[in-house]
Amino acid sequence: MPKKLLIKTWGCQMNEYDSSKMADLLNAANGFELTEVPEEADVLLLNTCSIREKAQEKVFHQLGRWKRLKEKKPDLVIGVGGCVATQEGDAIRKRAPYVDVIFGPQTLHRLPQMIKDSQSNHGPVMDISFPEVEKFDNLPEPRADGVTAFVSIMEGCSKYCTYCVVPYTRGEEVSRPIDDVLYEVAQLAEQGVREVNLLGQNVNAFRGPTHDGEMASFAELLRLVAAIDGIDRIRYTTSHPIEFTDDIIEVYTDTPELVNYLHLPVQSGSDRILTMMKRPHTVLEYKSKIRKLRKVRPDITMSSDFIVAFPGESDQDFQDTMKLIRDIDFDISYSFVFSPRPGTPAADYPCDISEKVKKERLYELQQQINTQAMRHARQMLNTEQRILVEGPSRKNIMELRGRTENNRIVNFEGSAELIGQFVDVNITDVFTNSLRGELVRTEAEMDLRVAMTPLEVMEKARKEDELGVGVYTP
């Protein structure tokens, strides 16, 4: 009987990607199968996030629930990974000595051996180091789970914004070799993936080594991924405005696979607050980049992160943020009240903003975004939209569900063979969280671009000969 594995994931899309790789690793090494029932599991893994307030206590509450399972089942292995593990590894060992494995985001590839060591040593094993790109060199081949997939192209961040823990929990920026990224995308395309989401904490800072010792830019990577047959839609997250350069904007002019949607976090609309955050750009510079982008993609939809009530934020600073939201006309926001993260400079900044004002500002910001989002949705009424059909509708299993370029769900009537294909639909109704459409044409009636088959890409990607020397076929 196969062993069972449960992975509980908190946090960003990078954590979701990491969790999928943990599952693949343990399946390849030990035959583990995933379960959603904790009582069935032989291994329980918690992949944590430390971005929000009280992240550590949330971890210990979850571990307390799992402790009761371990008391009934002593051979149960409990592991904690992710950013909280990196920050609080020693504290976890002290407060939760029943935890068997503690690992960081950069050492998840060592998980099978760490579990084995914990069982043979009958004691906890911890590895929260930063071993550069070794993580990617030791991951199993990707397994597609549907028609969309995440592909991590880099790790870490070197910007050190004053509020952010990422450089301390995931390390400095490290990019994967470009051939490795293309090989993974080609493998996914060969398995039926049609849309890839390129991931990184600062994804547009990608500088990937090539087979001949040069460095490939993020713009070059986007064009190469777009050239892989079957990959007809590309997203990426998360971007930094300072790295959103003209060569990336140029890709939007000639790469239809790049979606008409961009998440480019600005955090605040006040230059004074941006300086305190150590964000190396002004509001005017941010708006200038968006203006350039909209010259080549006039209909592009924008989203951003916002931190409300950063220490020292005045009423005028907040109103500057509200003005920027209206000026850019953001469609989506991920907005939070400032949460001091231990070990970051901003955690020591004095803050005299009352809880009442914090909540009022967050509410005002989110209401403005919601108003703009509904207007954007209504503007799609009676327009034709191309969607990627992801599966049955969650509201009605007799219908299908797809996603537009600007990340909106569309439910429509259609047959199951359309799953995994692109279709054009006419938007007939607008709801708060979704749209309704009618089928106009199927993929067979489209002229999607073909450049290079996945197998051709895989043949050209970097390999090693019997002596371990990297070779490349141009």
UniProtKB/Swiss-Prot annotation:
An annotated GO cellular component: cytosol
Radical SAM core domain residues: 143-375
EC number: 2.8.4.3
Catalytic activity reported: N(6)-dimethylallyladenosine(37) in tRNA + (sulfur carrier)-SH + AH2 + 2 S-adenosyl-L-methionine = 2-methylsulfanyl-N(6)-dimethylallyladenosine(37) in tRNA + (sulfur carrier)-H + 5'-deoxyadenosine + L-methionine + A + S-adenosyl-L-homocysteine + 2 H(+)
Cofactor note: Binds 2 [4Fe-4S] clusters. One cluster is coordinated with 3 cysteines and an exchangeable S-adenosyl-L-methionine.
A molecular function (GO) term: metal ion binding
Subcellular compartments: Cytoplasm
Superkingdom, natural source: Bacteria
PANTHER family: CDK5 REGULATORY SUBUNIT-ASSOCIATED PROTEIN 1, MITOCHONDRIAL TRNA METHYLTHIOTRANSFERASE CDK5RAP1
Function: Catalyzes the methylthiolation of N6-(dimethylallyl)adenosine (i(6)A), leading to the formation of 2-methylthio-N6-(dimethylallyl)adenosine (ms(2)i(6)A) at position 37 in tRNAs that read codons beginning with uridine.
Name of this chain's protein: tRNA-2-methylthio-N(6)-dimethylallyladenosine synthase
Organism: Photobacterium profundum (strain SS9)
Lineage of source species: Bacteria, Pseudomonadati, Pseudomonadota, Gammaproteobacteria, Vibrionales
